[in-house]
């Protein structure tokens, strides 16, 4: 295996696969990443997520970062609305979790804030078929990737990794379901930063408590506007199956490296509370 160049072309999973292949093969060939969806930011990150059976394995290493990223809006013209909704919420979640990370810093904060502001503004129009805004959303995805590659992510991604592998629900869709509940859970530790993001996106709120509420409600409203499921039950995970596996889910979430940079220390009860909010009714 002695390639002159490796090209990762596709969505987040395809790019992660190519990145892992290059990493484990030990090749010195440069890796060029060309994303065809606006979501993962994998074209600029040190992360790759691999799935084996019912487990997702997040890999983190600087050697996973591609040498070249190419953003071409032509790949976005014919994306189906459902895919735009799923991947777009991944952008929003990357930006929010990077901005509120316990490892956040000035430069990644600037990247994350701009990524969130742009994605929140552009996602509805992109979903509705406006191809002119899709490059802006594409760039927001890359900015969010640059931010979380430095700052890390949080509980929402940790839970999405575990639930996605177990119930085979698309990653971005899970983020959309989980994110408002995770914001409520993390609010005591990150209220001020959530409020800043709300104001950056034009959601207002003179007091931090009001701005945080506006952020959560704005995300719930956007989720509905994009025809995304509101609960795990609506996404196809039967509540009885979720509750039967709760112990295993909690254990796996606590072991996910994304928990290390959550703004608050992640505890067993916190994960259970989020699950209760997002599972849906029997």
Describe each model-derived feature in a short phrase.
Residues 1-74:
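Glycine/threonine-rich beta-strand-loop-alpha-helix active-site module
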Residues 103-111, 125-136, 151-156, 209-212, ...:
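Flexible, glycine/charged-enriched surface loops at secondary-structure junctions
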Residues 154-214, 220:
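C-terminal catalytic subdomain
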Residues 39, 142-175, 256-261:
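Glycine-rich phosphate/pyrophosphate-binding beta-alpha loops
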Residues 204-282:
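C-terminal charged capping/lid subdomain of soluble metabolic enzymes
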Residues 47-151:
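Carboxylate- and glycine-rich phosphate/diphosphate-binding segment that chelates Mg2+/Mn2+
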Residues 20-30, 150-152, 162-167, 186:
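Alpha-helix C-terminal capping segments
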């Amino acid at each position: 295996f002695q390639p002159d160049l490796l090209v990762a072309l596709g969505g987040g999973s395809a790019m992660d696969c190519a990145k892992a292949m290059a990493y484990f093969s030990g090749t010195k060939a440069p890796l060029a990443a060309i994303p065809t969806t606006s979501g993962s930011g994998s074209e600029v990150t040190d992360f790759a997520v691999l799935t084996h059976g019912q487990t997702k394995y997040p890999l983190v290493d600087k050697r996973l970062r591609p040498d070249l990223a190419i953003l071409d809006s032509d790949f976005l013209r014919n994306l189906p609305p459902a895919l735009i909704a799923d991947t777009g919420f991944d952008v929003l979640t990357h930006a929010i979790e990077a901005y509120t990370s316990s490892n956040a810093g000035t430069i990644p904060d600037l990247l994350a804030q701009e990524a969130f502001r742009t994605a929140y503004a552009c996602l509805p129009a992109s979903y509705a078929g406006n191809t002119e805004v899709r490059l802006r959303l594409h760039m927001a995805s890359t900015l969010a990737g640059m931010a979380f590659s430095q700052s890390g992510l949080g509980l929402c991604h940790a839970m999405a990794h575990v639930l996605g592998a177990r119930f085979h629900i698309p990653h971005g869709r899970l983020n959309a379901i989980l994110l408002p509940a995770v914001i409520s859970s993390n609010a005591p530790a990150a209220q001020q930063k959530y409020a800043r993001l709300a104001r950056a996106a034009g959601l207002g709120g003179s007091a931090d408590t009001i701005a945080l509420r506006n952020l959560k409600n704005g995300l719930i409203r956007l989720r509905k506007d994009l025809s995304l499921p509101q609960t795990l039950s609506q996404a196809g995970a039967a509540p009885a199956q979720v509750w039967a596996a709760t112990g295993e889910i909690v254990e796996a979430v606590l072991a996910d490296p994304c928990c290390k940079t959550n703004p608050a220390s992640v505890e067993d009860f916190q994960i259970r509370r989020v699950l209760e909010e997002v599972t849906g009714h029997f």
